[in-house]
From Swiss-Prot:
It comes from the Eukaryota. GO terms for cellular component: cytosolic large ribosomal subunit. Gene3D superfamilies: Ribosomal protein L30, ferredoxin-like fold domain. Belongs to the universal ribosomal protein uL30 family. Binds to G-rich structures in 28S rRNA and in mRNAs. Plays a regulatory role in the translation apparatus; inhibits cell-free translation of mRNAs. Keywords: Ribonucleoprotein, Ribosomal protein, RNA-binding. The keyword RNA-binding applies. This is Large ribosomal subunit protein uL30B. One of its GO terms (biological process) is maturation of LSU-rRNA from tricistronic rRNA transcript (SSU-rRNA, 5.8S rRNA, LSU-rRNA). One of its GO terms (molecular function) is structural constituent of ribosome. InterPro entries: Ribo_uL30_ferredoxin-like_sf, Ribosomal_uL30, Ribosomal_uL30_euk, Ribosomal_uL30_euk_arc, Ribosomal_uL30_ferredoxin-like, Ribosomal_uL30_N_euk.
Length: 248
């Protein structure tokens, strides 16, 4: 008599603690995946907004440039003169003062963020800052930065000052975390705020570490003479841009 082999299926019961862990792990994976999807979507939205804002700024800059050209042409046609608005922003570069300095001069240089040779910093034009610059004038050169130079400085030499640390501005998140509360979310927002000396210029400028430039290609002419006397220190007005381009 042949024996038939019967297959017996034995249901193994999963221990309760293992089942709960599996369920928790599954929920955790789902939550992580959901957060990642939401983060990617939010980043995509922010990038689109940054691009839109940059385009709006570019249109604003072009309109301002066109207005300036139109006003100059109109004045020339009418035989008059066009007087541009007074500058609201100065770029100051330290060119001297490695050795012992007068304590008052040293303190003023620090207030201007010019602690080291070839440091550069933006300064809002007002009575107080003009007086500060006059105190240290033989040690600095300054003038009115162009939009292109402001942009190059921030993109190529820009560092953030965060908790006393010099942090590279590698992406817009660094800016947004520190300045988002005042409406500055991207590097283009930062450039615009500095260029226009906007309502949150103080916060934007405080965020920036002093620019560390190199010695100018071709060197200086005569650092102990003023610019108006064929030297280097003092007010260069728009010609500050030529110098800084050689130092970036």
């Amino acid at each position: 008599m042949s024996q038939k082999k019967q297959k017996i299926q034995v249901e193994q019961k999963v221990p309760e603690n293992v089942a709960k862990k599996t369920q928790r792990d599954s929920k955790l994976r789902d939550a992580v995946a959901k957060r990642r999807t939401e983060r990617l979507a939010a980043n995509k939205t922010r990038r689109a907004q940054w691009e839109k804002t940059a385009q709006a700024y570019e249109a604003e800059y072009k309109a301002a440039d066109k207005s300036l050209v139109d006003n100059l042409r109109k004045a020339k046609t009418e035989g008059g003169f066009y007087v541009p608005a007074e500058a609201k922003l100065i770029l100051v570069v330290r060119i001297r003062g490695i050795n012992t300095l007068n304590p008052q001069v040293r303190q003023t240089l620090r207030l201007l963020k010019l602690r080291q040779l070839h440091n550069a910093a933006f300064v809002r034009v007002n009575k107080a800052t003009i007086e500060m610059i006059r105190k240290v004038e033989p040690y600095v050169t300054y003038g009115y930065p162009s939009r292109a130079v402001i942009k190059n400085l921030i993109y190529k030499r820009g560092y953030a000052k965060i908790n006393g640390q010099r942090i590279p501005i590698t992406n817009n998140n660094v800016i947004e975390q520190q300045l988002g509360k005042v409406g500055i979310h991207s590097v283009e927002d930062l450039i615009h705020e500095i260029t226009t000396v906007g309502p949150h210029f103080k916060e934007a400028n405080r965020f920036l570490w002093a620019f560390k430039l190199r010695g100018p290609r071709g060197g200086f002419i005569a650092k102990r003479r003023s610019f108006i006397n064929q030297g280097d220190w003092g007010n260069r007005e728009d010609l500050i841009n030529d110098l800084v381009k050689r130092m970036i």
